[in-house]
Amino acid sequence: MDPEATGLENIFLRGHLLGMTKGEIEASIDDIAEFTDLGDFLELPMKTYSAGMAARLAFGISTAMQNDILLIDEGIGAGDAAFQEKAHKRIEDLFTRTRIVLIASHSTNLIETFCNRRVELGHGRVERDERI
């Protein structure tokens, strides 16, 4: 994400990096805006966003676009309880349209809720690999 660019410009930037057409990106903007609840903040440079706002936008962009593989690194820990509930629903939807979702998290509850396999690492080595 470019901190000098607006939220809207970052939506286009990330979409282009993912190989989307301008039309595909434009079609996803309303969904991203509604999901993130950023409203007029999408018109402001990202350097004015709080860390939580930036995380919500990054998560909203990544999950609004069609992906074969989605990597989430503590992505749904940002925001209040209402946003986290929206994020959980979004992840549930991702499982129906994304082939592989990889979540890096310290949250046992998150892993047990959304994952069918858990791999735990310690000091760069696999310590546990199990189906859950």
Predicted segments — roles?
Residues P45-Y49:
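Conserved ABC ATPase signature
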Residues S50-L57:
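ABC ATPase nucleotide-binding domain "signature motif"
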Residues S105-H106:
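H-loop/switch region of ABC-family ATPase nucleotide-binding domains
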Residues F12, E24-F41, A58-G60:
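Conserved ABC ATPase "signature" region
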Residues T63-I72:
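A short, proline-enriched helix->beta-strand linker immediately N-terminal to the Walker B motif
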Residues Q84-T96:
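Helical segment within the ABC ATPase nucleotide-binding domain
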Residues F114, R118-E130:
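H-loop (His-switch) and adjacent beta-strand-loop-beta switch element
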